[in-house]
Design a protein with these regions (language model features):
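Short secondary-structure boundary/capping segments
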Residues: 11-12, 32-37, 162-169, 234-239, ...
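Conserved coupling segment at the C-terminus of the helicase ATP-binding
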Residues: 13-216, 223-231, 356-385, 395
Length: 441
């Protein structure tokens, strides 16, 4: 809200604007519209008090958990009708906390749109965000003559339409290099499918323990800090907001004896070459915001929710392979993530490249299972598969290239874009107050 480019009519005109690494920009843009304060803040306590009756009516137990700060996984929405009725009280509380940077940077954007905002409370924090994107406030972006988004993958194509106001045809037909269908080598392995003894606990305790002879980085992407004690007990280093840069630099300097764990960091970290040759993705990613978590609870089988999850996973898969000649073994643990990758109901949400990589991994796991049936040891077979990548086995490399070259890049799911575009059109009409037309869209 304090952009140097100006807001609204005071925005500086820009001819062309480029968003590099646009999937990371999406989170930054969403955060720029969102007030998020912890349960120790005065604003949190005030909003909880103002809407205590409305929250209690939704569930006495859930309300008490939130009130006592113990319901970290519990969240409740503030009903929109109560929010609208008490919007002036909300505005007053926001102004009382205007010196808080978590409020002051957002206030200029939402101060006249309180009625079009939504709020959620958990035992940890309060989240207030607009129901509709306010990207038009940034005239330097929304009114630029040319807008370019650059990315190897996209976390949320729907946000490009509803959040950035891009035309659906531009999203359906991105500019791509037809000669670069895929890049880099990813051996995706699901050890529990080789043998049931290779479960999450065994893999985590085995591969993440310290090893002074390790000649490459071993990294784990976890969905949250919930298992931090397990990782620390093993001897892994768990990166925090304050230490994440130093942890990445240690890997790039060749300090490999301790494995690294990054919680909820599926984008924004690059671990090329030897900085990460083994990447463990542990369990399915969580929704980052209370808004997304609530939507996921209400619509667990929604196509849009599943697309977001798939693209989040794909971002994680790309952390350790950062170039055409790069390679990495990616190990999948956690029953929920394994099911998401293997179920026909959800595999379809991945890109053609990722689907092929999952298929390749499934085929070589199948070969390993056949050997187990003949009496081979599961642990040794698993290590043998990993070494085919790490030791640059020619047979493996040829098999991977031949399989990846069969990808059809035209295999792209566009069916959601038209629906999202209609939602965006209806929202724009609603904001203008044309309710009848909004309902008819």
């Amino acid at each position: 809200g304090k952009t140097a480019f100006g807001l609204g009519s005071k925005s500086i005109h820009v001819n062309s604007i480029i968003l590099d690494d646009s999937q990371a920009c999406i989170d930054s843009i969403k955060n720029s519209f969102t007030i998020k304060v912890d349960n120790e803040s005065d604003l949190y306590k005030s909003i909880l008090n103002i809407f205590s009756d409305e929250l209690r009516e939704q569930g006495e137990g859930s309300y008490l958990e939130i009130q006592n700060g113990v319901g970290n996984n519990t969240l409740l929405p503030i009903p929109y009708w109560s929010w609208i009725d008490k919007k002036e009280l909300v505005a007053q509380e926001l102004l009382k906390n205007i010196e808080d940077k978590r409020v002051s940077f957002i206030w200029p954007l939402i101060k006249n749109e309180i009625h079009n905002c939504q709020a959620f409370l958990s035992g940890e924090y309060l989240e207030i965000s607009p129901i509709f994107s306010l990207i038009d406030s940034f005239g330097s972006f929304s009114k630029a003559n040319h807008r370019f988004l650059m990315s190897a993958t996209t976390q949320d194509d729907s946000f490009f339409i509803k959040g950035l106001g891009f035309d659906v045809e531009a999203i359906k037909k991105p500019l791509v290099n037809p000669d670069l269908v895929w890049s880099g080598e990813k051996m995706i392995l699901i050890p529990s499918l080789i043998d049931e003894t290779l479960d999450r606990e065994k893999i985590i305790n085995w591969l993440l323990r310290p090893n002074d002879k390790r000649t490459f980085g071993t990294v784990c992407l976890a969905p949250s800090f919930a298992n931090i004690k397990q990782f620390q007990r093993i001897g892994a280093i768990v990166a925090t907001t304050e230490t994440i840069y130093d942890c990445i630099e240690k890997l790039k300097r060749g300090e490999f004896s301790n494995s690294m764990v990054f919680a909820n960091r599926y984008d924004g970290i690059d671990l090329p070459d030897n900085s990460c040759r083994i990447l463990i993705i542990d369990s399915k990613p969580y929704s980052e915001t209370l808004t997304d978590r609530y939507e996921e609870e209400c619509r667990p089988s929604s196509d849009i929710i599943n697309v977001k999850t798939a693209q989040r996973v794909e971002q994680g898969l790309g952390r350790s392979v950062r170039g055409e000649k790069d390679y990495s073994v990616i190990i999948i643990t956690g029953g929920d993530l394994v099911q998401f990758l293997k179920s026909p109901l959800t595999t379809k949400y991945f890109s053609p490249q990722t689907r092929m990589q999952i298929e390749i991994g499934g085929q070589i796991v199948g070969f390993a299972k056949d050997e187990i049936d003949e009496g081979a040891e599961a642990d040794k077979l698993f290590v043998g598969l990993i070494n085919k990548s790490l030791q640059r086995d020619e047979g493996w490399k040829e098999y991977y290239v031949e399989s990846m070259n069969e990808i059809d890049i035209r295999d792209r799911k566009d069916n959601l874009y038209d629906l999202i575009s209609l939602e965006y059109k209806a929202e724009k009409l609603f904001i203008k107050g044309d309710l009848d037309k909004a309902c008819d869209v």
